[in-house]
Every structure is written in structure tokens, then in C-alpha cells.
Amino acid sequence: VMWTVSLCVSLGVLGAARLEAACTKVEPGWLWNYDGAIAEKYRIRMTLVFGTDEIKGVYFYGSQLRDLRLKGRIEQGSRLLLDELDAAGKVTGRIDARFVTRDPKGRYGDSELACEVIVGTWSKPDGTGAMTIYLSMEGGTAGSLTRRYGAIGVKDDEVVHRGAQRFWRAVSSDERATVAASLRYPIRVMLGGKVVRLAGPDDLLARYDAIFTPAYREAIGKALPRNMFVRDQGAMLGSGEVWFGADGRVTALSNF
């Protein structure tokens, strides 16, 4: 009973005074990333492709970094219905949500929204185990679900993901040699207000603490090293703290 009351309260907070938006996006050649959480504690990132008649996508939990497939549709311009599928195509979960005109978390202020914020529930296929879901759009890039990083010449997205996750985990666990080996040299960093060129791993290790400050390590740790934004200069971790090349190695450190 207490769990049911808690869910209802959470849904009320997320949905109070939020009018349904009209999301009419049809862009089959674009990937739209959303960040958010299930039950306000399980961090997720979702990528959606808005086709003419259906929605396809993937999402993953920040704690697992493993894609779960999605397939569904938009009804009446605002209701988003998605099936979560396993590798065999069996439905393992369902998302019933709405695009809303106002962000219940206030990220967009008083702006009237269309496809930017999704609010609803995730549940098991039989409708049990319902939990709230909230997602906010982070950005979009040209590509497909099977070739996200084509803009930088990548044929296998997992090459970038493996490199990004190796670097990300190494920074979090202070494995300095692995961090140093994850970079493409020469590379430039900001030290003491000046741009410094690092010729190889030894240069980075000698200046490691000055480069990877506590604040910089924290920003990297909060970012999600999968299904990242991409442009011609590389795949972007977080808000641009780190950039990766087609080989999965770090090409830029924005440590300023």
C-alpha cells in the first residue's frame, strides 16, 4: 500500500499541471538522446528515432551500459508507447508516457515544449511493477541506431564505446597508466592558464594531478560513456569534458 501511495505521489509531482504536448517530429535519419531516470533513482539514457509510422530506439541504465531495444509509436501526438525488447524480440517491459508542454523539473523554465520532455511510467509486460520515468532531451545527431558515429568514420560503434568506457572507468578508479594509454598523442591541455602540448604518456603522468583535478574527475565520472553526441571532431563525453576519435582514443581533454 505504501509503495502504491509513493508511486501515485511521484506521478502527481511529475504530472501536475503539465499539459500534453504535440510531438510531430518525423526524422528517420536522426538520433535524439534523452537523459533521465526510472523511479527517480535509476539513471538512464534513451535514444529515439522518430519515423513516419513508428518509433525505434534503445536505452540503457547508467549502472549497466548495455542497450535495451525499444519499438513503439506516438498516439494522438502526445502519448508515447514503447515496448522494451530482448535479443529474441520478446517484450520485457513497457513504457507508457507523454510528451509535456512544461518541464516538471523546471529545466526549460516557462518555455512551451513539444518533444523535449517525456513523463510517464515503466512497467513489466503484464502492467505490474510500475515505476515513474522522466526524460529530458539532450540533443540530436544524424545517424542510425546501428551506426551512430558515422560522422567520424566509425563502422562499429562499439569501438568507440569500449575506448570511452575504458578511459571513464580508469579515471574513476585512478588507474593512471590506463588513462595515459587511452590518449592519442600529441595532445594539448590547459595548465596554469596556458595551453601545454603533451608528447606522450610520460608527459601526462608527470602532470596528472594538475590535469585531472577533483572537479574534472567528478565531471567525467558523472558523464555516460555510451550513445554519446557526435560531430565531425569526435564523440563527446558529457558536456564536452572529453572527446574521442574513431579508434576510441581520447583526442581532446577540456580540463579548463
Task: Tell where the protein language model's regions lie, with residue ranges.
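Boundary at the C-terminal end of the N-terminal hydrophobic targeting segment
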Residues: 15-21
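Central antiparallel beta-sheet cores of small beta-barrel/beta-sandwich binding domains
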Residues: 22-114, 118-134, 148
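Short, well-ordered alpha-helical segments enriched in acidic and aromatic residues
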Residues: 175-186
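Bacterial N-terminal signal peptides
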Residues: 3-14
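Short, low-complexity N-terminal intrinsically disordered segments enriched in polar/charged residues
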Residues: 140-169
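Short beta-strand edge/turn micro-motifs at domain boundaries
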Residues: 126-144, 234-256
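A short gly/proline-enriched turn/hairpin at secondary-structure junctions
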Residues: 58, 189-195
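Surface-exposed, charged secondary-structure patches
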Residues: 75-78, 195-244
